[in-house]
């Protein structure tokens, strides 16, 4: 499992999650199974875990434990699946690590990384229809500019979109190398990798509809918790962290606090930690992909 993905903030997240050793918990992002395995290790024989992942590669990491139910699904459907599993009355905690797994980054043919010459794929669910190739070759310039600006927070998003559209007029952009060549004139010197990472983030988020999935997940997860149940979420970039922070505060991703007739806030959660928990220096030294992680904890009211 460590070769597939090193779980981030493992002790901090699982300790925050578990309130009862015989409780029922969900790991919404199974990945390499690191968080799930640690939850199972700490639970009593009566405890149960339901884990989710849409990547078939991740499903192969299933530990041999009768207390685990592993479901291949986008986590946006977590509430529906938990009801189907007989947990309609609510569960004790839900954990989600929103990062891309090391396996996905390091498997060249998946197309998640600019470090390899590979097809522009980026699908977390390899049976999904749309790939990054479809986006860079099929989206109008205005659409490309929008996703680069919003999802990647790319400074010169319009220039990048123009270069992509110009390059594909000559020939389709089908590989990571071809994309890099198409936009290389707009890459800032001494910060090429950081800039490319933002471009790839934007494409990946669009391919996998990550923000829409996250919004539906937050809503479903808050409904799936019993009162006092914990929602524990690890974020990696400002866009998703803002969504999680706003949802914990207000019950919606805009962060707009709504009140009932009596003036009471109607948000279903309350924050457990005012400021996010960050990885220790030792963890970052051992796993550089943990450096941007933020852990937020909320409790169902």
Region annotations inferred by a language model:
Residues 1-301:
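S-adenosyl-L-methionine-dependent methyltransferase catalytic core, i.e., the SAM/SAH-binding region
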């Amino acid at each position: 499992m460590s070769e597939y993905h090193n779980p981030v903030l493992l002790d901090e997240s699982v300790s925050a999650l578990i309130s009862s050793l015989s409780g029922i918990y969900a790991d919404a992002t199974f990945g390499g199974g690191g968080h799930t395995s640690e939850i199972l290790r700490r639970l009593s024989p009566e405890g149960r875990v339901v884990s989710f992942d849409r990547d078939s590669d991740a499903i192969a990491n299933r530990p041999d434990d009768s207390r685990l139910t592993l479901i291949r699904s986008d986590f946006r459907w977590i509430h529906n699946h938990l009801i189907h599993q007989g947990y309609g009355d609510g569960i004790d905690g839900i954990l989600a690590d929103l990062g891309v797994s090391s396996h996905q980054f390091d498997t060249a043919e998946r197309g998640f990384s600019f470090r390899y010459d590979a097809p522009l794929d980026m699908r977390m669910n390899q049976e999904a229809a749309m790939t990054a190739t479809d986006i860079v070759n099929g989206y109008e310039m205005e659409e490309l500019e929008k996703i680069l600006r919003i999802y990647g927070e790319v400074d010169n998003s319009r220039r990048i979109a123009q270069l992509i559209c110009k390059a594909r007029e000559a020939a389709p952009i089908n590989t990571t190398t071809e994309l890099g060549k198409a936009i290389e004139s707009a890459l800032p010197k001494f910060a090429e990798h950081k800039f490319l990472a933002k471009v790839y983030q934007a494409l990946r988020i669009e391919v996998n509809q990550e923000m829409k999935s996250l919004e539906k997940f937050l809503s479903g997860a808050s409904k799936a918790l019993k009162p006092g149940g914990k929602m524990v979420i690890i974020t990696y970039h400002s866009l998703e962290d803002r969504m999680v922070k706003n949802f914990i505060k207000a019950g919606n991703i805009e962060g707009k606090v709504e009140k009932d007739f009596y003036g009471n806030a109607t948000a279903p959660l309350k924050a457990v930690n005012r400021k996010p928990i960050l990885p220790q220096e030792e963890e970052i030294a051992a796993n550089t992909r943990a450096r941007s992680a933020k852990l937020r904890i909320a409790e169902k009211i």
